[in-house]
């Protein structure tokens, strides 16, 4: 019952925002960092037509392809690996793609890069010919400094797309 992040982001938070702020709910984008980046990617691709753009900073890209990710997916979703597919952004990108633009940033010195598996998402984006950018930022790790350095780019990316809608 607790920690239903998909519903929190797509229903609860959206309801609060739409009821309390003058927001055009027809123009939405989604972004996140690390596990939140993974969530942004899977939610964005899992809800075609809802989001105009997705961006992620150092996202988990292929949890089904790493032992630690498989352990987490099994704990949350059970042992049936078919249930895991909709929670793997690389597989979703390859199979479904996204109907808007995508921006991904990851640091070349990210200490978790082997667990994040960004090459799988980059490959899926290339194979799918996904509209967007996948950027490797030289010298950056997974830290707050990385996020604070590039988050403005992500906000501008979304603002440009939403304002030119």
Over which residues does each language-model region extend?
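Non-catalytic cap/lid and distal C-terminal segments of serine-dependent acyl enzymes
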Residues: 1-165
């Amino acid at each position: 019952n607790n920690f239903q992040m998909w519903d929190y982001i797509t229903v609860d938070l959206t309801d609060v925002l739409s009821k309390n702020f003058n927001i055009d709910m027809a123009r939405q984008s989604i972004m996140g960092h690390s596990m939140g980046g993974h969530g942004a990617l899977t939610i964005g691709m899992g809800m075609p037509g809802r989001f105009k753009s997705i961006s992620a900073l150092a996202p988990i890209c292929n949890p089904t392809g790493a032992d630690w990710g498989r352990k987490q997916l099994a704990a949350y979703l059970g042992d049936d690996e078919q249930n895991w597919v909709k929670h793997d952004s690389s597989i979703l990108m390859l199979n479904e793609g996204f109907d808007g633009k995508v921006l991904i940033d990851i640091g070349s010195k990210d200490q978790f890069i082997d667990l994040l598996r960004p090459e799988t998402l980059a490959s899926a984006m290339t194979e799918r010919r996904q509209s967007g950018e996948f950027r490797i930022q030289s010298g950056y790790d997974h830290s707050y400094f990385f996020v604070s350095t590039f988050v403005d780019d992500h906000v501008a990316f979304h603002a440009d797309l939403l304002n030119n809608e």
